[in-house]
C-alpha cells in the first residue's frame, strides 16, 4: 500500500469518527448550537489539528456532512423518478413499493443517528429544506416528461412543491416515530399515499380536470395581472 493510500484511509477514518461523534453529541445535548471542536474531537479520539486539517470550523463541518448526505439522497431519489407510471400503477395494485424507494429509506435508516439528530428539535432547521430542494431538483425534469401542456407553469410548480414536501414530511414523521415501520413497509405507505386524494379517505373522491383547471388558472392570472396594472396606472 502506498503512502498516499495510507493517508487517504487515515483521512476517511478520521472523518468517519467525527461524523459518529457529531451524532453522539447531538443525541446527548440535543442542540447543534452547543457543538464545539473540543468536545467533538475528544469524543472522536482525535486532535483539534486533525479536525482543522479537514474543516474550517463547525459550520463548515456541518455543511460538508449535510452535502454528503444530500448527494446520497439525491442519487436514490433519481432512481425513484425513473419509474414509469404503468409500473407505479402495478406497484400500487400489488401493494409493492415504488422502484428505488426501499433503497432510499434503507439508506436513511442506516444513517438514522446522524440524520435523525439533524432533523430533530436541536438539529439544523435548514436541513429539511435542503432535502426538499435537493429532491425537487431531481424530480422536476422527470415530472415534466410527457406532461399535459396546460398543467405546466404555476400549477405544476406548486404541485411538485406540494408532493415533494409531503413525501419529505412523511420521512420526518417516520423519524419522529422512531422508525417504527421497516423501510419496506414505509416505502409501500409512501407509494400509495402519493396517489391518494383527500376525498378517497371518506369515500367521496374529487376528480379534477387538470387541463381545464390549468386554463382557468391561466386566465385568472392574466385578469389579475391586468387589474394590478390598471390599479398602478390609476394611482399614478
Where are these regions (language model features)?
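Amphipathic alpha-helical packing segments from all-alpha helical-bundle domains
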Residues: 122-149, 157-168, 199
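Amphipathic alpha-helical segments used for helix-helix packing
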Residues: 102-129, 141-142
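Alpha-helical structural segments
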Residues: 17-24, 43, 60-83, 99, ...
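C-terminal peripheral helix-coil segments that are non-catalytic and often amphipathic
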Residues: 140, 144, 156-157, 165, ...
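Basic, helix-initiating cap at the start of DNA-binding domains
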Residues: 1-30, 34
Amino acid at each position: 500500500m502506498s503512502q498516499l493510500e495510507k493517508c487517504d484511509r487515515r483521512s476517511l477514518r478520521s472523518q468517519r469518527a467525527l461524523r459518529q461523534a457529531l451524532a453522539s453529541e447531538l443525541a446527548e445535548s440535543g442542540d447543534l448550537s452547543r457543538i464545539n471542536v473540543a468536545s467533538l474531537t475528544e469524543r472522536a479520539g482525535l486532535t483539534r489539528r486533525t479536525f482543522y486539517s479537514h474543516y474550517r470550523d463547525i459550520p463548515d463541518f456541518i455543511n460538508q456532512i449535510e452535502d454528503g448526505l444530500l448527494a446520497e439522497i439525491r442519487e436514490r431519489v433519481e432512481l425513484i423518478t425513473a419509474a414509469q407510471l404503468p409500473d407505479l400503477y402495478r406497484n400500487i395494485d400489488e401493494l409493492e413499493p415504488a422502484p428505488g424507494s426501499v433503497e432510499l429509506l434503507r439508506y436513511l435508516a442506516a444513517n438514522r443517528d446522524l440524520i435523525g439528530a439533524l432533523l430533530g428539535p436541536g438539529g439544523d432547521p435548514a436541513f429539511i429544506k435542503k432535502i426538499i430542494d435537493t429532491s425537487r431538483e431531481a424530480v422536476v425534469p422527470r415530472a415534466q416528461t410527457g406532461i399535459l401542456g396546460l398543467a405546466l407553469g404555476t400549477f405544476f410548480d406548486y404541485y411538485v412543491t406540494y408532493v415533494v414536501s409531503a413525501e419529505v414530511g412523511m420521512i420526518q414523521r417516520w423519524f419522529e416515530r422512531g422508525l417504527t415501520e421497516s423501510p419496506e413497509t414505509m416505502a409501500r405507505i409512501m407509494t400509495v399515499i402519493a396517489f391518494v386524494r383527500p376525498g378517497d379517505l371518506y369515500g367521496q373522491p374529487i376528480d379534477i380536470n387538470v387541463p381545464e383547471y390549468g386554463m382557468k388558472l391561466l386566465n385568472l392570472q392574466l385578469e389579475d395581472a391586468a387589474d394590478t396594472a390598471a390599479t398602478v396606472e390609476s394611482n399614478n
